[in-house]
């Protein structure tokens, strides 16, 4: 074990040593860079931009580009990369994860590898967790990019897009020409306060944003945006009917900020483009009432560990009587099982003010990792409707899926993927296994002096909360600021009530008060401030210490229980002790906490029985501390297995998705002829194999199978050779297709593309719907000791082939039966597509679970 640890640290140390040598060479270029004009630095970038033949050539320019970026940052934004920030940049350039502590300046770190990789003249994506950070970071770092001749775009979840530009172009041009510098010549310190910045340079290099089309934002050198919007744009690009409507420029290089949050915490959350379904709201109410009549452990079992519900034999019999059916698991009754299990989950596994809140008559999901409300997101598969029935709020229509992809498979499309976070090392195995990314721990610029105390463990939740209140009271009396981290809204409000009774002034930050987040966080480090927060205080915020707080020991972090992941605990601790500041952290635990109760079980209780201690006193026992860590590792392992399992399922779909999207791209970029030729071949071959195998050929069956195009195919029953018969039919259909093209002339291409793309999309949509039912059924089969992934592969393979055959047949028959009519078929299709919306599916159990073209096209009608 020790040997393995040593190996890990050695590996990290080797990586850092290599990077330090490169940084030493960059530092040697520093003096020369100081004397280089803006124009010369920009010329260097533009000289090589688009001229490199392969990505490996970038390394030849790394030192010079990094030196120029550092100097440009010093002059335009008054920030100079520390050596450790350059090390972080080197790690990002290599397609790895840079683990950097809070306050180490990750935003600035990304600039050097972005400018370097821009030499490939391909769009680079910087991925953030929310719109605010995307806009802030793009504008904050914008002057660096603009000064070096790069364009900066921003996309956000409202569908709007922007480009960063100089606020006063004439003044900026003057500043660049005369080499203005925000950093004063006579200042050699490390940090530059706003008061010390050279005013004329600050004014010259101020930026603004202008609204542009999303397509234009993607044509910039670097585009900042959220993970969900990048993913949705990819899906929307694969629903368009015109190449001009595509916005993305491929997937070359992405730098993911808060990479653990996006690639791990959200990995169970597929992106889905959906539209409304036809399920009636009364159905959900009906099954909710039935579910309330079922008794736990008698009619069903609840598995909290895996967050699922399983009907018992007695429960199945009871439901069969109640619903008046002979066999609940008959395919005809699959919807009943689906509604019952969703209702049971809504009642027993999804808790108000923990998993969701009810606000203005709506059920709003709360992100379990950040504590933030996720507006617009809904659980899929009818689960959200089941919760709405439980809460007695209006039930919204269930949705049907048009396109979907997991974050895992979306981000694996990038040729080079890198990430930054304060907490990644504990998940290194997963990053490597799923994304092929190594984690490199970057040294801090200043030593970390925060004190992390041992856990205090209590027998009951009540004892724990009393101890927390006492600790807060003691620290508050001396003026030390305290940030208390809770795991749910419910618990944050309970603690708030206790503090009110004690007369301790405090502020609460949870999903209900998220509008005040920036204001609350800004005050959290001030003297005497007490802040209670859910996980949402853990990311994208910087807590600065107020006057006199360092002398009091800095910010105290109190954790009220351990999270399922050690990484989330580390994020909470990381709010204190930034940039060498003093600070403390301590966790108060109870053996009744959810994590201990669900996963620790008897082992923790046995240790408790061994320890004799007075009520209200904390327990110190090395075995107990070790057990808690084992419990967290166990849960991390379970969650990793779930994510890996989901990836295996989605990877089957991913191959099929790429095939479908490949067909679409070929049709959009070229013409429809190749696809139709393939469709005719496959369609005819399948019919020949079906009806002309064996001794007796089924001529009648063969004729009927071509009924939809009977006007164009005459079956010659005199041909007794299968291959000749096939070729004869193919030639007849191909000739009919050629004549149809001639009839329509130049209009045909637009019409044919539109029809075939819509057929592909509709069949793919139906296929995705069927796949969801397969996922549900194989989850049940997994209880019967069958490998669910293997079962899934088998079933979807045949289903996909059937779907493709339907697509081929429909494409051929629709095009051959085309005739000119002045109607609004296409406009109706567009109206239907306009109903399509984007949702974000929670997809827990297995895990639980377009854009219109602006071009005018010829009118058409399908004759069948």
From Swiss-Prot:
<dbReference type="InterPro" id="IPR001650">
    <property type="entry name" value="Helicase_C-like"/>
</dbReference>
<keyword id="KW-0811">Translocation</keyword>
<dbReference type="Pfam" id="PF07517">
    <property type="entry name" value="SecA_DEAD"/>
</dbReference>
<dbReference type="Pfam" id="PF01043">
    <property type="entry name" value="SecA_PP_bind"/>
</dbReference>
<dbReference type="GO" id="GO:0031522">
    <property type="term" value="C:cell envelope Sec protein transport complex"/>
</dbReference>
<comment type="function">
    <text>Part of the Sec protein translocase complex. Interacts with the SecYEG preprotein conducting channel. Has a central role in coupling the hydrolysis of ATP to the transfer of proteins into and across the cell membrane, serving as an ATP-driven molecular motor driving the stepwise translocation of polypeptide chains across the membrane.</text>
</comment>
<dbReference type="GO" id="GO:0017038">
    <property type="term" value="P:protein import"/>
</dbReference>
<protein>
    <recommendedName>
        <fullName>Protein translocase subunit SecA</fullName>
        <ecNumber>7.4.2.8</ecNumber>
    </recommendedName>
</protein>
<keyword id="KW-0997">Cell inner membrane</keyword>
<dbReference type="GO" id="GO:0005829">
    <property type="term" value="C:cytosol"/>
</dbReference>
<comment type="subunit">
    <text>Monomer and homodimer. Part of the essential Sec protein translocation apparatus which comprises SecA, SecYEG and auxiliary proteins SecDF. Other proteins may also be involved.</text>
</comment>
<dbReference type="InterPro" id="IPR014018">
    <property type="entry name" value="SecA_motor_DEAD"/>
</dbReference>
<keyword id="KW-0472">Membrane</keyword>
<feature type="binding site">
    <location>
        <position position="542"/>
    </location>
    <ligand>
        <name>ATP</name>
    </ligand>
</feature>
<dbReference type="GO" id="GO:0008564">
    <property type="term" value="F:protein-exporting ATPase activity"/>
</dbReference>
<dbReference type="GO" id="GO:0065002">
    <property type="term" value="P:intracellular protein transmembrane transport"/>
</dbReference>
<keyword id="KW-1003">Cell membrane</keyword>
<dbReference type="InterPro" id="IPR020937">
    <property type="entry name" value="SecA_CS"/>
</dbReference>
<feature type="binding site">
    <location>
        <begin position="103"/>
        <end position="107"/>
    </location>
    <ligand>
        <name>ATP</name>
    </ligand>
</feature>
<keyword id="KW-0653">Protein transport</keyword>
<dbReference type="InterPro" id="IPR011130">
    <property type="entry name" value="SecA_preprotein_X-link_dom"/>
</dbReference>
<dbReference type="GO" id="GO:0005524">
    <property type="term" value="F:ATP binding"/>
</dbReference>
<dbReference type="InterPro" id="IPR027417">
    <property type="entry name" value="P-loop_NTPase"/>
</dbReference>
<dbReference type="GO" id="GO:0006605">
    <property type="term" value="P:protein targeting"/>
</dbReference>
<dbReference type="InterPro" id="IPR036266">
    <property type="entry name" value="SecA_Wing/Scaffold_sf"/>
</dbReference>
<keyword id="KW-1278">Translocase</keyword>
<dbReference type="GO" id="GO:0043952">
    <property type="term" value="P:protein transport by the Sec complex"/>
</dbReference>
<keyword id="KW-0547">Nucleotide-binding</keyword>
<comment type="similarity">
    <text>Belongs to the SecA family.</text>
</comment>
<dbReference type="GO" id="GO:0005886">
    <property type="term" value="C:plasma membrane"/>
</dbReference>
<dbReference type="InterPro" id="IPR000185">
    <property type="entry name" value="SecA"/>
</dbReference>
<dbReference type="InterPro" id="IPR014001">
    <property type="entry name" value="Helicase_ATP-bd"/>
</dbReference>
<dbReference type="InterPro" id="IPR044722">
    <property type="entry name" value="SecA_SF2_C"/>
</dbReference>
<dbReference type="InterPro" id="IPR036670">
    <property type="entry name" value="SecA_X-link_sf"/>
</dbReference>
<dbReference type="Pfam" id="PF21090">
    <property type="entry name" value="P-loop_SecA"/>
</dbReference>
<keyword id="KW-0067">ATP-binding</keyword>
<dbReference type="InterPro" id="IPR011115">
    <property type="entry name" value="SecA_DEAD"/>
</dbReference>
<keyword id="KW-0813">Transport</keyword>
<keyword id="KW-0963">Cytoplasm</keyword>
<dbReference type="InterPro" id="IPR011116">
    <property type="entry name" value="SecA_Wing/Scaffold"/>
</dbReference>
<feature type="binding site">
    <location>
        <position position="85"/>
    </location>
    <ligand>
        <name>ATP</name>
    </ligand>
</feature>
<dbReference type="Pfam" id="PF07516">
    <property type="entry name" value="SecA_SW"/>
</dbReference>
């Amino acid at each position: 074990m020790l040997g393995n640890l040593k190996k890990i640290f050695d590996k990290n140390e080797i990586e850092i040593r290599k990077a330090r040598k490169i940084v030493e060479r960059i530092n040697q270029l520093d003096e020369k860079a100081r004397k280089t004009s803006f124009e010369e630095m920009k010329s260097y970038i533009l000289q090589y931009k688009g001229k490199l033949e392969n990505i490996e050539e970038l390394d030849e320019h790394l030192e010079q580009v990094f030196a120029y970026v550092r100097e440009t940052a010093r002059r335009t934004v008054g920030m100079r990369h520390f050596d450790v920030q350059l090390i972080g940049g080197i790690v990002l350039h290599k397609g790895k994860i840079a683990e950097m502590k809070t306050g180490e300046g990750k935003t600035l770190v990304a600039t050097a590898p972005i400018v370097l990789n821009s030499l490939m003249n391909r769009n680079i994506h910087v991925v953030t967790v929310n719109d605010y950070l995307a806009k802030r970071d793009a504008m904050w770092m914008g002057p660096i990019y603009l000064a070096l001749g790069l364009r900066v775009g921003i996309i956000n979840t409202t569908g709007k897009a922007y480009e960063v530009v100089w606020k006063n172009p004439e003044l900026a041009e003057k500043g660049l020409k005369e080499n203005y510098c925000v950093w004063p010549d006579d200042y050699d310190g490390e940090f530059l306060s706003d008061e010390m910045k050279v005013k004329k340079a600050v004014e010259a290099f101020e930026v603004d944003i202008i609204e542009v089309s999303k397509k234009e934002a993607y044509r910039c050198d670097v585009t900042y945006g959220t993970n969900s919007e990048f993913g949705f744009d990819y899906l929307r690009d694969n629903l368009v009917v015109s190449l001009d409507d595509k916005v993305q420029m491929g997937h070359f290089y992405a730098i993911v900020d808060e990479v653990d949050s996006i690639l791990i915490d959200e990995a169970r959350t597929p992106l889905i483009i959906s539209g409304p379904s036809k399920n009636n709201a009364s159905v959900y109410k009906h099954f909710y009432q039935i579910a309330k009549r079922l008794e736990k452990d008698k009619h069903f079992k609840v598995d909290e560990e895996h967050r699922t519900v399983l009907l018992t034999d007695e429960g199945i019999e009871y439901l069969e009587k109640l619903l008046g059916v002979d066999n609940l698991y008959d395919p005809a009754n699959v919807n009943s099982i689906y509604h019952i299990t969703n209702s049971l989950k809504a009642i027993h596994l999804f808790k108000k003010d923990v998993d969701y809140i009810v606000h203005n008559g709506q059920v709003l999901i709360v992100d379990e990792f950040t504590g933030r409300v996720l507006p617009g997101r809904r659980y899929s598969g009818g689960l959200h409707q089941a919760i709405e029935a439980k809460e007695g709020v209006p039930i919204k229509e269930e949705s049907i899926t048009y396109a979907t992809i997991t974050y895992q498979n979306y981000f694996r499309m990038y040729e080079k993927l890198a990430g930054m976070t304060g907490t990644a090392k504990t998940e290194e195995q997963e990053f490597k296994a799923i994304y092929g990314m190594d984690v490199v721990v970057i040294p801090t610029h200043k030593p970390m002096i925060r004190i992390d105390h041992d856990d205090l463990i209590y027998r009951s939740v009540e004892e724990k909360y009393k101890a927390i209140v006492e600790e807060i009271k003691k620290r508050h009396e001396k003026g030390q600021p305290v940030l208390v981290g809770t795991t749910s809204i419910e618990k944050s409000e309970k603690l708030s009530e206790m503090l009110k009774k004690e007369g301790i002034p405090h502020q609460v930050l949870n999903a209900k008060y998220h509008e005040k987040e920036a204001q609350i966080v800004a005050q959290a480090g001030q003297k005497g401030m007490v802040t209670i927060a859910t996980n949402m205080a853990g990311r994208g915020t910087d807590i600065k210490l107020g006057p006199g707080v360092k002398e009091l020991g800095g910010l105290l972090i109190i954790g009220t229980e351990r999270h399922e992941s050690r990484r989330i605990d580390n994020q909470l601790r990381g709010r204190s002790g930034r940039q060498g500041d003093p600070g403390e952290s301590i966790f108060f635990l109870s053996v009744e906490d959810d994590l201990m109760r669900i996963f620790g079980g008897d082992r923790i209780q046995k240790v408790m029985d061994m320890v004799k201690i007075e009520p209200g006193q904390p327990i110190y026992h090395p075995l107990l501390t070790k057990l808690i860590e084992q419990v967290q590792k166990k849960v991390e392992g379970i969650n990793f297995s779930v994510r890996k399992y989901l990836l295996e399922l989605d990877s089957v779909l991913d191959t099929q998705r790429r095939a479908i999207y490949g067909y679409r791209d070929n049709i959009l970029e070229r013409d429809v002829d190749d696809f139709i030729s393939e469709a005719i071949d496959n369609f005819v071959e399948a019919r020949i194999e079906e009806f002309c195998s064996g001794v007796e050929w089924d001529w009648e069956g063969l004729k009927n199978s071509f009924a939809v195009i009977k006007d164009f195919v005459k079956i010659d029953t005199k041909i007794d050779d299968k291959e000749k018969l096939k070729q004869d039919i193919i030639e007849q259909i191909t000739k009919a297709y050629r004549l149809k093209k001639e009839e329509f002339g130049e209009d045909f291409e637009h019409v044919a593309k539109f029809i075939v793309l819509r057929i592909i999309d509709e069949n793919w949509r139906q296929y995705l719907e069927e796949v969801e039912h397969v996922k549900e059924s194989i989850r049940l089969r997994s209880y019967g000791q069958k490998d669910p992934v293997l079962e899934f592969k088998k079933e979807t393979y045949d289903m996909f082939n059937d779907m493709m055959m339907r697509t081929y047949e429909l494409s051929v028959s629709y095009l051959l039966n085309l005739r000119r009519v002045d109607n609004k078929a296409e406009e109706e299709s567009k109206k239907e597509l306009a109903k399509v919306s984007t949702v974000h599916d929670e997809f827990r159990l297995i895990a639980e679970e377009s854009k219109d073209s602006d071009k005018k096209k010829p009118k058409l009608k399908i004759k069948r």
